[in-house]
Amino acid sequence: MAASCEGVFDGIYDEGAGSDTEVKAGQLYIDATSWNDWYYVDLDSLLELTDKGDVAALQQAQTKFTPWPIPQTENADAARDSSGMYIYWFDIFGKGMSYYERRGYKPTAPQPEPEHWTFAVHRDNVRTNGGSVFETSYTSMEELPASASSFVDKTFTADTWSERDVWVDRTEMLNCIMGNQGIKINQVLSSWLVFNIPPIPPTYTFNNHVFILRTKDGEYFALQLANYTDSKGTTCYLTINYRKIAL
Amino acid sequence: MSHTSLFTTLALAALPLGTFAVEPADSLLTGNDLEQVVVTGTRSPKLLMETPVLTQVISHADIEKADATNLKDLLQQVMPGVEFSFAQNQMVHLNFSGFGGQSVLILVDGERLAGETMDDVDFTRLSMDNVDHIEIVKGAASALYGSNANGGVINIITKQAAKKLNACLDARRAKHNEQRYGLALQGGSSRWSNAFNMTHTTQDNYDVHSDDGAVARTVTTIFGDHTWNFADKALWQPSDRLKLTGRAGYFFRQVKRSEESPERYRDFSAGGKALWTLSDNDVLEGSYSFDQYDKSTWLKSQKIDTRNYSNVQNSVRLLYNHTFGDNVLTAGADYLYDYLSNNKLDAVHRQQSADVFAQLDWKLNRRWEFVGALRYDYFSDHHIQRLTPKLSVRHTPVDHLNVRFGYGMGFRAPTLKEKYYDFDMIGIWTITGNPLLKPEVSHNFNLSVEYVKGNYGFVVAGYCNRVTNKITSGNPYYASATETMPRLPYVNIDRLYVAGFEATARARWSCGVDARLSYAFVDEQAGHKDGQKLASPYLPARKHTLTAHADWTHRFSTLLDGMVALDGRFLSGIDNQEFKNYYKVEEGTITVHYPAYTLWKLSAQMSIGKHLKLIFAVDNLLNYRPKYYYLNSPVVDGTNMMAGCKIRL
């Protein structure tokens, strides 16, 4: 009777199932919910920790990431029409996001970044550090070939300039106006999670294909978005599988 | 038959609060609605023609003819002054003669429903497959029903199982792959009966297209869903003076808005009721009701079902009716435990509420009848208390003519959501609860004249409502200079006036023609004393609405019944003032025009023998499509053909 006062059949839901932050080796868990920060991942340093066998340090490095704020303060000295906030109107409630108008620009300092990094995430956006990406048809890391040689002749896509994708300033969102960071992002790797708006509230399209990241140093890494929510269903908690592929 | 024994008979037939109603004969040909027993207006069984509180009845025959799937389909087809629109996320919002969903109390067999979205109950859970009839009382009725009975009460009375074992299967298909399947099993003996109903519906998403030049938000895709609805009701009558009923239900809906992460809605309900006829003069009823409404998101690829909302209501009710002479004394008490868990609230909240009420139905003579009621309600959260009175008078100056007058006070206690909401709506604004909200209070005056003789019936009813402290979402504001996201608070607004009248004419001829024409006028004025404008997301009531129905029913032979029906509704256009810029209210408003529209439906039903009925319909006969699919525009995209059948075994 007492239980029924506050509900029955709790068991049919997956509330609180497991721990969000415990990941296995070769897996990242990033709280990328912030609209104002990038989170950088250095895969080389993670592999070093793996090789050392320092389980605690690896767990920490795979789940704790430092936010790198997106500059939003106007900086007149910044190069015009490069780094900065780009104000766009989108026809969110009409014909959709492919209809837009540029409404303004505010120069800001460039995006700060750490000395060593491989890729970075901001909600559904991904950048690489001078790398390029190829999308495979594999949906499991185990299916991948042991050598990267089979990917060498594939077409890899480098990061490209974007001023409408990295949504930052939402203060005029209801008026369909968004402040976006002007920055290079990797459109192929970013396709692992697509933020659809309309409808309101937005929906997400999730692509669990394995992507191959070729770094500027010629290394190959396999990356796969395994999940994009926490156990309570909050979006932009990213679980990412990673693995280095030798040539 | 003495009045006392008449009362007892009615009580046993209908049960106070309409636990069961007797299933009508399986025929398109039905008797006179005036013999219908109604319970909603007085919480005691009364003949429709004699009740001092004007009660509109949507009969079982009306429901059958409408072939409606749920309450929304039915009300918008047969009731004037009713319109449904979309809230955010395409949740359905009701405007019921100037009152929104939270101010109209919707009951099933007298029991409240848990759960709400954007102020309205989930209308898809109110399936019509097991409904005997619906009683509608307009105007404030908080003296009998407590909070939320501000603008009226809609009481859905479910069927009582037939004693004879039978089964019924039905199916219907329509546009956008809309499918409906139903199963009904019932049976029993002289002392018990059981009815089981199941309904499954599904509909695909579909796109709608607006012209260029929209000045308000438009919808581009209408989201389909699929639902499952199960209900079982058992009756056991161990003696002539005692009836025990039990029920259980399960509802599931999955909206097809997102392929990856569809939203799910579930409801678990159960209850028991005992009706004990202590003597020819005394009837006691006790009931317990459980209702749990959950919302969750199904993360398909991860196979995770995460719940983000649960509203659980446990209620206990006692109702006692004592007759003396022609008079009835009614007394009752209710207790409700309300639990709300919502990830958009600051925390889990609980509230207990209790009430006591009494009513005297004094029948001076056959020409005059007076009903007076008084109720005290208590809510534990912030210790809200209300005392609400009600007075109704029926005068029958000449036979067949009833004049009814009523005054009722209504109130709506702020919900836990309205007090404690804290929801970042994807950065648009934070919807913020207000623990200091006052209860919304209304004063309703109504006057009606009803004339029914032979095959003809006419009703004219006027009403006016003065509402103070209406609870609604207010204008957006910034809590501080450093906040970048506005807050959208819940507020009390100073005043709401809703006045209007309705006129209905109905005729039935022995040749099998049944016709009904209803007109409703509603004038709704809301605002602050200082003239400050409101950013209400919902359209006010349209001033003029007209509904028309005509059908011809004919028995061609002992094996063949047929019916052809035409239903139409007209709603006048309306201009609504909406903010140009929700972030800068000072920029003023623009006028958004919602044009008049009319929708017509032609349907035909054919019963072949005892076992088969075929149903065809062409809805939106005139192929109406709104120029702009605003949230408050009718969701139709042209003519819709429907075909179905019902097999009875």
Locate each region found by the language model.
Chain A
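Surface-exposed, beta-sheet-biased, low-hydrophobicity segments with strongly acidic/polar composition
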Residues: 6-247
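C-terminal motif of bacterial Sec signal peptides marking the signal peptidase cleavage site
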Residues: 2-4
